[in-house]
Amino acid sequence: MEIKGNKNIARVTVHGVPDKPGEAGNLFDTLGEHNINIELISYTPGEGRTMNISFAVVVNDLENVVNILKKLYPYRISFDKEVAMLSLYYDGLGKIPGIAGKIFSMLGDNDINIELISTSINSITVVIKEKHLEKATESLKQIL
């Protein structure tokens, strides 16, 4: 298993995006046209027929991202540059029952709140406050 931490990121949330086909595509196409690489994406239903889209970018791109979004979209935008990503990689991670719960419980036991989650068959990535990255990394090593 490989554990990686990344402090060089920022979380951006675009609030109240219409929940209809093509909206997320338009948003991320626009950022791509400006050479913005997206590290992680999470979406949650908003009020009514809207959604909130959160994503992580390299912190050096944050100002550019916010300026692009403010010019093109009327939605509320929030961001946090005091976050970090913690990722666990393992070939076959998805075949280990309960691994996500074990990781999330460990974070909770250490009073570390998860801001974003992304999973795949071989990885689990969480965005947490940067000040907790070292503690979370060491605690994760202990439970694995």
Predicted regions mapped to residue ranges:
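A conserved regulatory-domain signal marking ACT and ACT-like small-molecule sensing domains
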Residues: 1-144
